[in-house]
Amino acid sequence: MTAEQASALLTVMTGFIEQEAGATRKVVAAITDLDYKPDPKSRTAGELAKHLVTADVWFADSIADGAFVWTGDSGTPPELTDPAAIATWHEKHLGDRLAKLRSMTSEQQLREVEFFGMKAPAVTWLGMMNNHAVHHRGQLAAYLRPMGSKVPAIYGMSADESLV
């Protein structure tokens, strides 16, 4: 990968992540029962929402810093007490991290970073970050109607929200 390709990938992926983050916050804000879980093996809606928003920040920090360091669940910020607070926290902290990612030098974008035994240039891990968020947002969106909430439009209108 050339420096120009890495820069283009960074621009495209941070744009995608920023766009997806808006949909993520809509899904989080739609939660009406943080304790809801569809199965005993599932996380609660609150646990899943908190994981989703804090993982976005962890991924971004790890990519920008050039190292994924997993020390287990380091705890949830205490201010993540309700859906609105979770969405607000995500907007603030992910916005800061996207700026940090966009300021990476070519050398930082291209440095090899290991993620659970896989090695790739730092900038390529933005795809994994985006996929992780989309995956967990999909899980959370599937919780909404069974908990009695409305499903927001994500990629197009839903049965509960029109785009026109």
Q: Where are each of the predicted segments found?
A:
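Helix-adjacent hinge/juxtasegments
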Residues: D61-S62, G66-M104
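Acidic catalytic patch
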Residues: L101-F116
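Short, contiguous alpha-helical
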Residues: L10, T14-R25, D33-G75, E114-V164
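Hydrophobic alpha-helical core bundles mediating ligand binding, dimerization, or RNAP-core interactions
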Residues: I17, A21, V28, H90, ...
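Short coil/turn linker and secondary-structure boundary residues
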Residues: M1, R43, P78-T81, M104, ...
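Active-site rim elements
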Residues: S7-T14, L80-A87, N130
